[in-house]
């Protein structure tokens, strides 16, 4: 049965969507912060003395941790400093957004515009294909695999990637006018249900995505918003983490990689460690982008202003997030997830393209084959029929069975399980 929660109603206005997520998430530690709400106050995180003995916790063995005292060894790092707390001003940001939505039209002239910053991007569906490449790359760096039973979870990551590169109207996302590689948002929610994700987990991931789509759209639609955030690292970080939706992606990643014998992992039971990991990933992503010279000038640049001081503060947050995660119940997943930015940024085409002058690298045949099955060609507009030509030339059409698993029909003949046809892409990473 498809998910039929009230929050899927396609008739809601943008303002009503905003109110829905305010009601769903509620306030965090700051009164009036919903939906930019956090239960963890990063400015209050305390660093525990390092005894040099980690036998009490295996968590230290996961992820990439660079201790505070060793940072001066790296020319791209240095010392740390506690950030001045601006978190309690988040209610001012919420009030500003409330007022903007009172006067904002439902549709803006720039809705649908490409915002990737890469001049060669001209077709939103081609941009979506690159976003799918990036989504799968993130997934494997987090520690996932490309097995077919996680197809819709990976499509979810694709939906989370695309609003950074295309200005998407929240209404069109919700009502199905907008399609990601031919898939509507309702398709994704129904697919998650077919994959066995529980209704509560789906609703949490759904609301996280709504929040991301809204905050991404707002940062592009409202020219007065980002100036209120820039130069205030803890305040900008709160907003920036929501625009990346690292929390919703983490919830589905944990669903995919948790040991079945331990049962499902719910945000309600693990909110503390999950929030810290979602913040940590954005911090390590920005640390790595700064090291490669591609952070400065981004819309949600957390170190804007006094960049040298803001970078000290960013490193301060990273060190404390990683140490706290060391002792958490799911450290084996969360420390890798939280520190993944340090290793995926220098490896992924998404960031290497920016280093190379904001160009695009060709999608090679091997990648094209992997990406082809994520395209719903029956629903692509005519002008996008030629995307991924190297994958399309294989004449392989993806089909779903009742369990959300992919089968392939090759040239109209035998149906093959993905695992039988492409064993090389089912290998777990990490």
UniProtKB/Swiss-Prot annotation:
It catalyses: (2E,6E)-farnesyl diphosphate = alpha-humulene + diphosphate. Keywords: Lyase, Magnesium. Its EC number is 4.2.3.104. Pathway: Secondary metabolite biosynthesis; terpenoid biosynthesis. Xenovulene A is a natural product exhibiting little structural resemblance with classical benzodiazepines yet is able to displace high-affinity ligand binding to the benzodiazepine site of the gamma-aminobutyrate A (GABAA) receptor and could be potentially used as an anti-depressant with reduced addictive properties. It is an enzyme of class 4 (lyase). GO terms for molecular function: alpha-humulene synthase activity. GO terms for biological process: terpenoid biosynthetic process. Induction: Expression is significantly up-regulated under xenovulene A producing condition. Its cofactor is Mg(2+). It comes from the Eukaryota. Transmembrane segments: none annotated. Belongs to the terpene synthase family. Alpha-humulene synthase eupE subfamily. Alpha-humulene synthase; part of the gene cluster that mediates the biosynthesis of xenovulene A, an unusual meroterpenoid that has potent inhibitory effects on the human gamma-aminobutyrate A (GABAA) benzodiazepine receptor. The first step of xenovulene A biosynthesis is the biosynthesis of 3-methylorcinaldehyde performed by the non-reducing polyketide synthase aspks1. The salicylate hydroxylase asL1 then catalyzes the oxidative dearomatization of 3-methylorcinaldehyde to yield a dearomatized hydroxycyclohexadione. This is Alpha-humulene synthase asR6. It comes from Sarocladium schorii. The gene is asR6.
